[in-house]
């Protein structure tokens, strides 16, 4: 796709796309470890993880599209925001270097607790369903809890990544494309690691 951007839009657009892709990938790679800890904590079998991440990434792309659209509109109206986003990009770079590995575990635990305040959460899976019933009342299954945390953590990461990428490019198409391909690549990366863990248990 990067080659298509270079041919269709020129080297400037190619540079913006590639920069956006690398920023998004470096910031969002934490999602892979959050997903792994989350599925382990909630005992979600690998065969159901595909369903959770399909809807999780679909929702993430919708939310990113909204964030990018709003951010681009704000920059068009208030040009000084570009400077603010540039400063945010520097701060984000520092945060990548000083990243703490336990943050993902904390976010996953808090996310499940937050859903528990909204509605009852069952401890048992009900096939691939997101909802079940406990005592005649509707309740979330661990699958929905996992989906909720996937979306919640993506919103948290998007708050970092979207302003950082908008500091590099204010072209919504390029920003969204770089986000989309980086996020879709994470799903493939996760299942590559998950399948490896199934075969080589010492990786756990």
Where are these regions (language model features)?
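Multi-pass alpha-helical transmembrane bundle typical of ion/small-solute transporters
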Residues: 1-204
